[in-house]
Amino acid sequence: MASERPTGSESGDAGVVLEGNREASQDIKMALYKHGRLIPSLGDAKFGRPMIAEILEKKFESYRNDQTLNIRGTLFFGVSSSLSGVMANLVFRYSFKVKYEALRTYASLTTLPFVATAVTYKLFVTDALQSGNISQESCVLRSSLIGVACGVSYPSALAFYKNGRLAVKYHTVPVPPKGRVMLHWLLLCQTGMKAMAVPLLFQIIFGVFNGLYHYAVCEKAYARIVPDD
């Protein structure tokens, strides 16, 4: 009977082991907490996989929506430039009294301003916003300048050139006198130049609103990607 009773050294060792187990379990509990958050175990991780997949799916869905909005805004901007090209072609054909090759001139005045606006806007606004190296004021300024350059100046110059060549080819306007060629053409198209003030104002306003809208969309996208600490 005496041999079955634990000796003093054995009971002391058992107490040390129990105390060590308590400390180890306490260390494990402390290790499971990091920055006030409980680290999930393997079992919790299995249950958390569907939640992570759902979060990633929502992230990708919001990214696709943002990309759709960006593309849609660029397309609308290009369409407005195409409409300005159609108006410029109509005005200068009337000024030069040209009635030939209407389909060819309207096709070029519709397509080229659209492509120029879309490409220029992507290079100077969209790419800059995605890199984060542009402010709101700079975004609005670039957008409005693109509207003026690609939506008014370029279509007007293109319509002047194409319809001026047709006017000379088909002799629909008097031949300019020597030494006054530029003045002659300016007098012929002064009415058309005044009429282009309407799309000029529209492109400036549309460029400002499009720049503000595009910047706000990118800011929301960055806020979702980079959460607050």
UniProtKB/Swiss-Prot annotation:
It is found in: Mitochondrion membrane. Keywords: Chaperone, Membrane, Mitochondrion, Transmembrane, Transmembrane helix. Its main location: mitochondrion. Disruption phenotype: Reduction in respiration by about two-thirds, only when the electrons were fed into complex I via the NADH-linked substrates malate and glutamate in ADP-stimulated mitochondria. Coiled coil: none annotated. GO terms for cellular component: mitochondrial membrane; mitochondrion. InterPro entries: TMEM126 (IPR009801). GO terms for biological process: mitochondrial respiratory chain complex I assembly; mitochondrion organization; response to food. Pfam families: TMEM126. Signal peptide: none annotated. It comes from the Eukaryota. It is a multi-pass membrane protein. Part of the mitochondrial complex I assembly/MCIA complex that comprises at least the core subunits TMEM126B, NDUFAF1, ECSIT and ACAD9 and complement subunits such as COA1 and TMEM186. Associates with the intermediate 370 kDa subcomplex of incompletely assembled complex I. Interacts with TMEM70. This is Complex I assembly factor TMEM126B, mitochondrial. It comes from Rattus norvegicus (Rat). The gene is Tmem126b.
